[in-house]
């Protein structure tokens, strides 16, 4: 038997005044969902137990039978495994979003974040941005000094891996939660100030490399947002998950 798991991630949404105080889901005409619910089993479950973050990275682990309190080690390690990036003990993985910051040569910390995805940059443009960073002498030297690399991706969310790293002493803030805000207070910080500075310095340097880079200017000329920055977040270390097929006799 085949199973289809449909996850309405964030579908509940919030009440909207223009909809009479209803959520979009409450307001919508959804006869198919209503029919499935009427013929199925409906209930409540806590997929994001406290103190873990309420997000897809914890919820999906739980939905597929892994206790996130035991097995959750961050979003990025799971994404790394999905694309074949092998983490060894001591490695830490990070999302390295390609972002759009306010254009211009004002101080980096005074810029605002315009888009957590650089306007959903994808394809060759996204690959060209990471290639520009990896080929820049100053940025590539800084990466090597940090014992890090950035894996290219045809999307706005490449992954970065840092060897010999414990990220638990640094606070990394999700960029999508702070659109339109000044980035200075949002940069990596925490009790491990030296490690936080490594990431903040790389983010600052990336903006300097990308602000007037040809791929940035090309996108702006096309009326798109330029990917003039990177943003590290979603940190995590190598995860060890139970074998799904061994436990449930099924695979995907």
Model regions and ranges:
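Beta-strand elements within well-structured catalytic alpha/beta cores of enzymes
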Residues: 2-14, 36, 219, 227-231
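Beta-sheet entry/capping signal
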Residues: 2-5, 42, 157-159
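Short, compositionally biased low-complexity segments
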Residues: 5-10, 92-112, 160-188
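Active-site nucleophile/metal-coordination loop of metallo-enzymes that catalyze phosphate/sulfate
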Residues: 12-138
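Short helix/loop capping segments that flank catalytic or ligand/cofactor-binding pockets
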Residues: 15-16, 168-172, 239-242
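Glycine-rich, mobile lid/loop segments that gate access to catalytic sites or pores
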Residues: 117-229, 235-236
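Long, well-ordered mid-to-C-terminal structural blocks that present hydrophobic/aromatic surfaces
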Residues: 228-252
